[in-house]
C-alpha cells in the first residue's frame, strides 16, 4: 500500500498565477491566485488523442475581463493565452454569497503547439455551472485539486485563493474553505517529478485505436467484519507517455472483468480495492468521514508496464487528494455517465456505469442509490423538454379556445 500514499499533486508541477480585475476607477472587483491544468480530448487522423497543458503564467486578463456595469452584467475574470485560448469565470452574488455562476473554456484546435494534427481546426467551447461558492467578505481557498468535468475537457484547479466583490483591494482576513480541503484526512508532502514540464512535447502521438467502452465487472473486498467495499463498474486506463524517439504515445487499456483479480484491505476508516489485470494494477482508496457519516474516494494509484516503444518501461502514478464518489454510509454511489479521475497530467482512470459502496455493506447487495450530478443533469433535460412541450400544447389549446369563442360571438341571431 506504500504506492497509494505517494501522491503526485498536479498543482505543484506549476506555480500559481496572480490576476486581478479593476473597474474604471481602479477599484478591484476580482482578485485571484490559482493554478489551472487542462486535459482536452480531440481527434487526430480519426483517432482520439489527449492534450495536457497548464494555464501559463503569462496569461493576460485585461482584454476580456470586466467588473460589470450596474445591474446589467456581472464581474468576469477572463484569461487568454496561447493561440486563441480563453478561460472565463463569470461571477454573481446573492445577499450573503458570491459564486462562479459559469465556467467557460474556449480552445482553438488549430493551435499546432497544443493540438498537433487536429482533425478539426476550429474553436470549441466547453461550459460548466456553479463550480465555486463562498461567503461575501471572505476569500475562497482551495489548496487541494478541484476537478471540473465537461464534454471532452477536464479542468483541474489547485492552490486557489480568490475573492470577488472584496471590500478592499486585497484578500479578506476571513476565508471560505472548499470541500476538497475540509474532507482531507491526511497530509501528503508533494513530490516533484525529475523532469516536470508544463505541456507535452509538440510532436504528435502515433495514431492509437481507441477501444470501445469496457465491460462492467463486479468486485468486492472482505475483511474480518464482512464486506467493506462492493463495486460494479467498467474500467479503462489512459496513459500518455514519452517514446524512445521523444514523440508522445497514448496507451488505452480496458480491464476485462473475468481476467481481473480483486483484493484489498479493510480498516476502520480506510478501505482499499486493488484490481489487477495483466501487467496493470489500479488501487482505489476509500475514506470514511465519521463526523458527516459519508464515504468518498480519496485516492487512486496506478502502476503498469508500458509498450516496448516507451522510453521508460514502467509507469506509476498516484493521487491521494481526491474527493469523488461521495455517498452516505449505508448507501451506494451510482453514476451511469462516464467519469474521469485525473491521477496526474499523464494518467486518467475512466469508469463507466459505476456503483460503489464502502464501510457498511450488506453482503453482495448495494444499499439505496445516491446518483451523481451528471446523471441528475441528464435526467433534468428530458423533464425540462417535456415541461416545455406541455406548456406549448397548453398555449395552443388556450389560443384555440379564445379564437373559437370570438368566432361564435360574431354571429347575429335572426
UniProtKB/Swiss-Prot annotation:
InterPro entries per record: Lamp2-like_luminal (IPR048528), Lamp2-like_TM (IPR048524), LAMP_CS (IPR018134), Lysosome-assoc_membr_glycop (IPR002000)
Disulphide linkage map: 29-67, 142-178, 228-266, 335-372
Compositionally biased intervals (Low complexity): 196-213
Annotated region (Hinge), positions in chain: 182-224
First and last residue of the signal peptide: 1-18
Second lumenal domain: region residues: 225-379
Location of region: Disordered: 186-213
Region (First lumenal domain): 19-181
Pfam families: Lamp2-like_luminal (PF01299), Lamp2_2nd (PF21222)
Glycosylated residues (UniProt): 33, 58, 71, 90, 108, 117, 154, 159, 168, 174, 220, 225, 238, 259, 289, 301, 319
Membrane topology label: Single-pass type I membrane protein
Transmembrane segments: 380-403
Family to which the UniProt record says this protein belongs: Belongs to the LAMP family.
Annotated PANTHER family: LYSOSOME-ASSOCIATED MEMBRANE GLYCOPROTEIN, LYSOSOME-ASSOCIATED MEMBRANE GLYCOPROTEIN 5
Record-given protein name: Lysosome-associated membrane glycoprotein 1
Organism, as annotated: Gallus gallus
